[in-house]
Swiss-Prot record:
It is found in: Cell inner membrane. This is Phosphate import ATP-binding protein PstB. Residues 36-277 form the ABC transporter domain. ATP binds at G68, P69, S70, G71, C72, G73, K74, S75. Disulfide bonds: none annotated. It comes from Burkholderia lata (strain ATCC 17760 / DSM 23089 / LMG 22485 / NCIMB 9086 / R18194 / 383). It is a peripheral membrane protein. The complex is composed of two ATP-binding proteins (PstB), two transmembrane proteins (PstC and PstA) and a solute-binding protein (PstS). Its main location: membrane. Belongs to the ABC transporter superfamily. Phosphate importer (TC 3.A.1.7) family.
Length: 282
């Protein structure tokens, strides 16, 4: 098996040690199987210290939401997981982001292979300037050699998982630009999962969508966690409460509190968290 295939047919990996995880400032959590472990993470835009000593465990097979005011660092943290910052020499990360025993910040793995394991969907729908079919097939072709029949099956599978197949199955050769905003975002999600990643990152995936499209995306997120570890950044606290199993509240580049979503929203430990959730922030 070559490196490009390894993420598609993963062997059993060593699970993170079981034990009690602690949220910011010592809040106890139940034992978790962490998919991603963030240890002493600091991030800089030139000299600006954007993330400050972040320690966090992302539970496997769950939806984790990052919330906080604009500029708090939640999107920056999300983008460190698949090294989006590597495109910009003035940006740097220090510390550890561990996944399956490997520090993603220092790995020698080809960055395209890393991003195949950790897919990402951005705030604004970004279909490629090609057909709906080719939008899905594009990434798959980078990592697998499939027959046309196999590719047809993969395209149908991904679009079905993204709850889009029934809406586009008769127009696969049409441009992705012809879809509505909500359909385009589901197309981007289908494109992200077509290469079968282990983790799916969603950066404000509903901010540009109408309420009906937002509802469909939220339903999709709930379904995806059965197959993927999902991390979502959102300004919408109600969305975080509806969609996530765990929530991290961030402020000024620091992780203030992390825990089970229900507890964070009903009985947070930190006053800063309570003030933000109840609208008394600032």
């Amino acid at each position: 098996m070559n490196m490009a295939e390894s993420h598609l047919n993963p062997v059993e990996r060593t699970a993170a040690p079981a034990g009690t995880q602690e949220a910011a400032h010592g809040r106890p959590l139940e034992p978790l199987n962490a998919k991603i472990e963030v240890n002493n993470l600091n991030f800089f835009y030139n000299k600006f210290h954007a993330l400050k000593n972040i320690n966090l465990s992302i539970p496997e097979g769950k939806v984790t939401a990052f919330i906080g005011p604009s500029g708090c660092g939640k999107s920056t943290l999300l983008r460190t997981f698949n090294k989006m910052f590597a495109l910009y020499p003035e940006q740097r990360a220090e510390g550890e982001i561990m996944m399956d025993g490997e520090n993603l910040l220092t790995t020698k793995r080809d960055i395209s292979l890393l991003r195949a394991r950790i897919g990402m969907v951005f705030q604004k729908p970004t279909p490629f300037p090609m057909s709906i079919y080719d939008n899905i097939a594009f990434g798959v072709k980078m990592f697998e050699k499939l027959t046309r029949s196999e590719m047809d099956d993969r395209v149908e599978w991904a679009l079905t998982k993204a709850a889009l197949w029934n809406e586009v199955k008769d127009k696969l050769n049409q441009s992705g630009y012809g879809l509505s905003g909500g359909q385009q975002q589901r197309l981007c999600i289908a494109r992200g999962i077509a290469i079968r990643p282990e983790v799916l990152l969603l950066d404000e995936p509903c901010s540009a969508l109408d309420p009906i499209s937002t509802g469909r995306i939220e339903e999709l997120i709930a379904e995806l966690k059965s197959d993927y570890t999902v991390v979502i950044v959102t300004h919408n606290m109600q969305q975080a409460a509806r969609c996530s199993d765990f929530t991290a509240y961030m402020y000024l580049g620091e992780l203030i509190e992390f825990g089970e979503t229900e507890k964070i929203f009903i009985k947070p430990v930190r006053k800063e968290t309570e003030d933000y959730i109840t609208g008394r922030f600032g």
